[in-house]
């Protein structure tokens, strides 16, 4: 019943002809995928969640603040051109991915979540972070890492993050692919406890592949 576009663009490649992003040097897409997905979602009675734009600057710098500026314009454009026209426009995915207390993350999630909700009369918003577990080894040559986050530290950091964003972020879908199978219960129990504490929905992002193959 739901389809989620995980991001509307990454660096110079975009899924819809955004006047703002095209002016900044992004490539004109051959098909307006956002319009197509919304039309198809309407046809089949599904809800479409729009994923925000990812400039790549956060990945380059570790500072989430970069992602707010571009998305200010993207959110306005998308609501005006699509959200206000299609009943299938069901919500927003704030596409910045973090795993730990990250520079600028609380402020960025709050600013983006608030703008999304304000412009769309309160449509739902969600995030999908990863857990900094033993399989979180992107950008290294290792199969696992030694300094994986403990359940206690994960709880402490996400308690602080949820405290700062729960008014404008409705749900959190932790990715499940970065921790060991026998750690799932411990981490997911904490995730549910924190979501309940702050009145958020606790979803799961089931990664149907294993990272330690």
Mark where each language-model region is.
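Glycan-processing catalytic domains of CAZymes
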Residues: 1-213
